[in-house]
């Protein structure tokens, strides 16, 4: 049985323009226009596919969104996700320069987080290609309790201000999720979005669209988030029986888990059993590890995921988080917050703490707190700077993204008018030649070669 899967991450970014005291800052719409000016200039649109096979566009609510090219390896996926940050950082530099030329005050910041000060939420959507065979309801039933409880390890952390005061939560998205499974993404915000757009052969595949997760700054957190989910899916697809872990009230559970830093908040299952998020994650870990090891197909990434999954749960059980304080986002952030609080004798509700929370997610390599920690070697990495830089210009070589990226590059170099999406490559000439690429695993295609040669 092949464990190869297509993955993709879509990340919506928060955007702001900090104006000097006493001056009116630009609105998010205005900042977005400056940010995408260069993109619109060459792409004639604020929705474009890039030479690296990825998609860059302006989403509703003026959120820049970057969707990685199709990846078939988790390390590759994280590399292309980080590459998106670098591409957007370049757009920020260009927009900043334009502001200064026009005498407009303010500094543009992009945040890879999931909530803004007005209480709006925007997402990090995970995409997993799954086989069409099998019961989707069963898949969702097994996956939802896993996705609700994984936040104890994969949450990005957040200072939540309530009428009762400020509190540190595990997840940024948890308070904004209202359903387990739905076809909407904004109105009801489900854990799993069921809108069926496989971007592949619909008879063979469907695209599982998970929208409950937090955006990850820490690369090992991203690896665990996607890697553990991938292995749970492998087990489900193989038909392995799983004890019923359905939650009595999933929406209450997701919030109660997020608001309890110990991972030990009691949650009630539909069966009446009372457990904790750590208990359920431990159950998934044991079951998944037994299954994956029994297949004999354990990759290096699988081993790293199991190691961090296990160490994270042990750390929560013991209350000593030092073993994961360089790898898990919320733990890294909580440590920063605690030290800053102690140094300056601050309450958690102090606005300076909220600014620190935000600065952790700033994608700037000179101002973002996470990136400054990474530059000083204070957090663990999965990728390298060289690979991330390469990913901004070169598509993954093992998936359909290679065909798209190469087509875009050659069409741009030949100054040809073209249209592309996830499955179509089209030259907008008299012949209107189009190639349909339905197989996301296919990186070589004679039809695409001929289309490129015809330029």
From Swiss-Prot:
<feature type="binding site">
    <location>
        <position position="422"/>
    </location>
    <ligand>
        <name>ATP</name>
    </ligand>
</feature>
<comment type="function">
    <text>Catalyzes the covalent attachment of the prokaryotic ubiquitin-like protein modifier Pup to the proteasomal substrate proteins, thereby targeting them for proteasomal degradation. This tagging system is termed pupylation. The ligation reaction involves the side-chain carboxylate of the C-terminal glutamate of Pup and the side-chain amino group of a substrate lysine.</text>
</comment>
<dbReference type="Pfam" id="PF03136">
    <property type="entry name" value="Pup_ligase"/>
</dbReference>
<keyword id="KW-0547">Nucleotide-binding</keyword>
<feature type="binding site">
    <location>
        <position position="57"/>
    </location>
    <ligand>
        <name>Mg(2+)</name>
    </ligand>
</feature>
<feature type="binding site">
    <location>
        <position position="65"/>
    </location>
    <ligand>
        <name>Mg(2+)</name>
    </ligand>
</feature>
<dbReference type="InterPro" id="IPR004347">
    <property type="entry name" value="Pup_ligase/deamidase"/>
</dbReference>
<dbReference type="GO" id="GO:0070490">
    <property type="term" value="P:protein pupylation"/>
</dbReference>
<dbReference type="GO" id="GO:0005524">
    <property type="term" value="F:ATP binding"/>
</dbReference>
<comment type="pathway">
    <text>Protein degradation; proteasomal Pup-dependent pathway.</text>
</comment>
<dbReference type="GO" id="GO:0019787">
    <property type="term" value="F:ubiquitin-like protein transferase activity"/>
</dbReference>
<keyword id="KW-0436">Ligase</keyword>
<protein>
    <recommendedName>
        <fullName>Pup--protein ligase</fullName>
        <ecNumber>6.3.1.19</ecNumber>
    </recommendedName>
</protein>
<feature type="binding site">
    <location>
        <position position="68"/>
    </location>
    <ligand>
        <name>ATP</name>
    </ligand>
</feature>
<dbReference type="GO" id="GO:0010498">
    <property type="term" value="P:proteasomal protein catabolic process"/>
</dbReference>
<dbReference type="InterPro" id="IPR022279">
    <property type="entry name" value="Pup_ligase"/>
</dbReference>
<feature type="binding site">
    <location>
        <position position="55"/>
    </location>
    <ligand>
        <name>ATP</name>
    </ligand>
</feature>
<keyword id="KW-0833">Ubl conjugation pathway</keyword>
<dbReference type="GO" id="GO:0000287">
    <property type="term" value="F:magnesium ion binding"/>
</dbReference>
<keyword id="KW-0479">Metal-binding</keyword>
<comment type="similarity">
    <text>Belongs to the Pup ligase/Pup deamidase family. Pup-conjugating enzyme subfamily.</text>
</comment>
<comment type="pathway">
    <text>Protein modification; protein pupylation.</text>
</comment>
<keyword id="KW-0460">Magnesium</keyword>
<keyword id="KW-0067">ATP-binding</keyword>
<feature type="active site" description="Proton acceptor">
    <location>
        <position position="59"/>
    </location>
</feature>
<dbReference type="GO" id="GO:0016879">
    <property type="term" value="F:ligase activity, forming carbon-nitrogen bonds"/>
</dbReference>
<feature type="binding site">
    <location>
        <position position="10"/>
    </location>
    <ligand>
        <name>Mg(2+)</name>
    </ligand>
</feature>
<dbReference type="GO" id="GO:0019941">
    <property type="term" value="P:modification-dependent protein catabolic process"/>
</dbReference>
């Amino acid at each position: 049985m092949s464990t190869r899967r297509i993955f993709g991450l879509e990340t919506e970014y928060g955007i702001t323009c900090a104006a000097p005291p006493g001056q009116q800052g630009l609105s998010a719409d205005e900042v977005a226009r400056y940010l995408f000016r260069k993109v619109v200039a060459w792409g004639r649109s604020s929705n474009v596919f890039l030479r690296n096979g990825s998609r860059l566009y302006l989403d509703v609510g003026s959120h820049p969104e970057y969707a990685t090219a199709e990846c078939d390896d988790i390390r590759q996926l994280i590399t292309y996700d980080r590459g998106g940050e670098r591409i957007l950082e370049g757009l920020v530099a260009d927009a900043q320069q334009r502001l200064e030329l026009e005498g407009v005050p303010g500094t543009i910041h992009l945040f890879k987080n999931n909530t803004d000060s007005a209480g709006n939420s925007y997402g990090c959507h995970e995409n997993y290609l799954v086989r069409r065979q099998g019961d989707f309801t069963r898949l969702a039933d097994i996956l939802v309790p896993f996705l609700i409880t994984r936040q104890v390890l994969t949450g990005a952390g957040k200072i939540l201000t309530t009428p009762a005061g400020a509190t540190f939560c595990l997840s940024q998205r948890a308070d904004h999720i209202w359903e387990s499974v739905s076809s909407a993404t904004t109105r009801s915000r489900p854990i799993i979005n069921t809108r069926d757009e496989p971007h592949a052969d619909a008879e063979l595949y469907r695209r599982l669209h998970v929208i409950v997760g937090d955006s990850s700054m820490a690369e090992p957190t991203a690896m665990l988030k996607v890697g553990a989910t991938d292995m749970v899916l492998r087990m489900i697809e193989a038909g392995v029986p799983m004890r019923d872990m359905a939650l009595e009230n999933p929406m209450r559970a997701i919030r109660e888990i997020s608001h309890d830093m110990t991972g030990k908040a009691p949650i009630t299952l539909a069966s009446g059993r009372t457990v904790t998020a750590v208990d359920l994650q431990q159950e998934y870990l044991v079951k998944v590890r037994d299954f994956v090891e029994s297949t004999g197909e354990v990759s290096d990434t699988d081993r790293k995921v199991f190691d961090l999954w296990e160490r994270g749960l042990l750390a929560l059980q013991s209350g000593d988080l030092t073993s994961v304080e360089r790898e898990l986002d919320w733990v890294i952030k909580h440590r920063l917050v605690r030290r800053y609080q102690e140094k300056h004798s601050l309450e958690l509700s102090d606005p300076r703490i909220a600014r620190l929370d935000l600065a952790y997610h700033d994608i700037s390599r000179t101002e973002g707190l996470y990136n400054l920690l990474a530059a000083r070697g204070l957090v663990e990495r999965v990728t390298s700077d060289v690979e991330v830089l390469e990913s901004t210009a070169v598509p993954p070589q093992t998936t359909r993204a290679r065909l798209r990226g190469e087509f875009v590059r050659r069409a741009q170099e030949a100054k040809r008018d073209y249209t592309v999406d996830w499955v179509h490559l089209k030259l907008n000439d008299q012949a209107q030649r189009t190639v349909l690429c339905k197989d996301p695993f296919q990186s070589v295609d004679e039809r695409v070669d001929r289309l490129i040669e015809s330029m």
